[in-house]
Amino acid sequence: MSVLLRSVTELCPVYSPFFGSMGITASIVFTVFGGAYGTAKSSVGISSVGVMKPEFIMRSLFPVVFAGVIGLYGLIVCIVLFINVNKSEYSLNRAFLDLGAGLTCGLCGLASGMSIGISGDCGVRGAAQQPKLFVSMLICLIFSEALALYGFIVALIMAATGDNSCVATASTSSSS
């Protein structure tokens, strides 16, 4: 069993990993909540379609697929943040960036899941009654999914940038 020895300084306090871990938790918890809500809400519409027109059930599964992808965004961000937290040097600056990245991905995923659930429920019911609405439903789902994708991209940028140094550097600037 190996023990991770961290350097503890003013820039890298012992509690820094707590904030990074909260980012990891927020990322997976909120994206899974969003995906679960989107799946549950759109499943109500799919069940209704199954009673009215059973031949449309397979076409009605798109909202469930879109909602499931949201959880994958959270999982990927969790893995990236976990790699950051498990480094021997973990600055408070890096920890706050990781917390922000987790919250960004998680809350965008939650909003996206809610949007997918509501538009998916109404969309599959409407498309069962009027098949011309199917393309409109897909466009609504794509833009709803894009909300989670935006949060995912911003979270990856936040996780990849920032200073993780535990040593203060003196910057010298020359003025003319």
From Swiss-Prot:
The cross-references to Pfam families, in alphabetical order and at most eight, read: ATP-synt_C (PF00137)
- What CDD domains does this protein's entry cite? ATP-synt_Vo_c_ATP6C_rpt1, ATP-synt_Vo_c_ATP6C_rpt2
Please state where this protein is localized: Vacuole membrane
List the Gene Ontology MF annotations in alphabetical order. Answer: proton-transporting ATPase activity, rotational mechanism
| UniProtKB keywords | Hydrogen ion transport, Ion transport, Membrane, Transmembrane, Transmembrane helix, Transport, Vacuole
Reading the lineage from the top rank, the first entry is Eukaryota
Residue ranges, Lumenal side: 1-17, 84-98, 158-176
**Positions of the record's site feature: Essential for proton translocation:** E145
Q: How does it sit in the membrane?
A: Multi-pass membrane protein
Q: List the disulfide bonds.
A: none
> Can you list the GO cellular component terms from the UniProt entry?
proton-transporting V-type ATPase, V0 domain; vacuolar membrane
Q: Does the keyword Transmembrane apply?
A: yes
Membrane-spanning regions, if any?
A: 18-38, 63-83, 99-119, 137-157
The residues exposed to the Cytoplasmic compartment are 39-62, 120-136
State the PANTHER family in the record.
V-TYPE PROTON ATPASE PROTEOLIPID SUBUNIT (PTHR10263)
Q: Which family does it belong to?
A: Belongs to the V-ATPase proteolipid subunit family.
Q: Subunit structure of this entry?
A: V-ATPase is a heteromultimeric enzyme composed of a peripheral catalytic V1 complex (main components: subunits A, B, C, D, E, and F) attached to an integral membrane V0 proton pore complex (main component: the proteolipid protein; which is present as a hexamer that forms the proton-conducting pore).
**Function of the protein:** Proton-conducting pore forming subunit of the membrane integral V0 complex of vacuolar ATPase. V-ATPase is responsible for acidifying a variety of intracellular compartments in eukaryotic cells.
Protein name per the record: V-type proton ATPase 16 kDa proteolipid subunit
- The record lists the organism as Entamoeba dispar
